[in-house]
Amino acid sequence: MSLSPYELEQEWQPRTYVGRLVKEGRIRSLSEIFEKNLPILEPEIVDYLIGPELKSETVDVRLVQKMTDAGRINRFRVVVVIGNENGFVGVGQGKARQLAVAIEKAIRNAKLNIIPVRRGCGSWECLCSEPHSVPFTVRGKSGSVEVILKPAPRGTGLVAGDAAKVVLRLAGIRDVWSFTKGDTRTTINFVKATYNALKQTYKFVTPLDWART
């Protein structure tokens, strides 16, 4: 469970170099971390910097079985998406015998997997210069699923499958055309492919991009 800002300030003892920089106030935003190409190895870093803005949604819950010497053990496998709806999104998976524990693990992993998402107005039909869509066409793949995201004019909405919509919305994308290949019924791959496509938005980076995030 995430700590309140006060509890985080009092109880969090950073174990990594980046964590110490964050708590000491020498790093004040996630953008700084990514600009310096530093790793996020503690979920508390994300809580500390954008915790109040962070939202999470569970997009897939499955009961899976594991064979052991003692027989079959049932566990929940959960996929969670987190984001601040303003340029940052993460996807995480968690497994546990109790659903609540699996969700908590997934949220923790999603924070460790958080990425910046470059937004813009890449559609020739719009040209409003507002960060409402993707700036150019991007592709992502996971397993058999491939997702292609194309810029859409303002007011189009998210033309995508339900699982992909969650990732896009929490990333702060409001308008996009999406095209898919493969078995999108496999939710975990559909979500990861969308996430991987958004990763590509920072394939081409200029210093000005960080100021706009």
Curated annotation (Swiss-Prot):
Residues 54-117 form the S5 DRBM domain. One of its GO terms (cellular component) is cytosolic small ribosomal subunit. PROSITE patterns: RIBOSOMAL_S5, S5_DSRBD. One of its GO terms (biological process) is translation. Pfam families: Ribosomal_S5, Ribosomal_S5_C. InterPro entries: Ribosomal_Su5_D2-typ_SF, Ribosomal_uS5, Ribosomal_uS5_arc, Ribosomal_uS5_C, Ribosomal_uS5_euk/arc, Ribosomal_uS5_N, Ribosomal_uS5_N_CS, Ribsml_uS5_D2-typ_fold_subgr. Keywords: Ribonucleoprotein, Ribosomal protein, RNA-binding, rRNA-binding. The N-terminal domain interacts with the head of the 30S subunit; the C-terminal domain interacts with the body and contacts protein S4. The interaction surface between S4 and S5 is involved in control of translational fidelity. Part of the 30S ribosomal subunit. Contacts protein S4. Belongs to the universal ribosomal protein uS5 family. NCBIfam families: PRK04044.1, uS5_euk_arch. With S4 and S12 plays an important role in translational accuracy. This is Small ribosomal subunit protein uS5. It comes from Hyperthermus butylicus (strain DSM 5456 / JCM 9403 / PLM1-5).
